[in-house]
Amino acid sequence: MLKIQKLSLAALMVSAVVSGSVFAEDKAVPSASDASYAVGALMGNQVKDLVDAQKEVIQYDNARILDGLKDALEGKVDVRKDEKIQKTLDGIQEQLVSAAKAKVEQQAKAAKEEGDKYRAEFAKKDGVKSTKDGLLYKITEAGKGDGIKATDTVKVHYTGKLPDGKVFDSSVERGQPVEFKLNQVIKGWTEGLQLVKKGGKIELVIPPELAYGKQGAGDSIPPDATLYFEVEVLDVNPKK
């Protein structure tokens, strides 16, 4: 069920904080008219945010929203006891969940198709090799010293891109390398970095099965995304 009631309570709480700051600075008590308008405007802003966020799924009628607000304020309706309203809110929630699921599935399909095409093209480049589970890589500098093990801690600089070239993360841009245990990251990294040594540089094209799979990662990496990385191994610390 949508948390409409919590939205209203949150608005009142924020209003209290805002009013409190006014009292502290000006020591002026707002009139009932001003206070009422302020609370209404605050709640209206929050409702507008909700309406705007859901407009691709549901076309709300502002006039009917005002009707519902008016009836609730006048005590003509109690959302907690009105079965029709509860059923309507549950229906809204189901519609939003269904739309979100469909959107994720659409994103995943597009990402998979784009990734499949990208990997096929990358595999044709000079010097590119593939592991048995589909990791594509190109070693631009092998590095020196002992081989890297999955249990080692490595310090690296990297840039990660989607097939369309969009950078989703880069320690290089931040100017700060990262350090981690190699067996605690995505499988493509665990496997790929063991192909070079300290000082090595490698390009990795990681299929979704060896990256973030159907879950994706936040807003920057969609489900079923193929990932491209340029990685430089700055240091290696074997497990003690």
Place the predicted regions along the sequence by residue.
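Cross-family detector of peptidyl-prolyl cis-trans isomerase
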Residues: 2-5, 22-240
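Bacterial N-terminal signal peptides
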Residues: 10-19
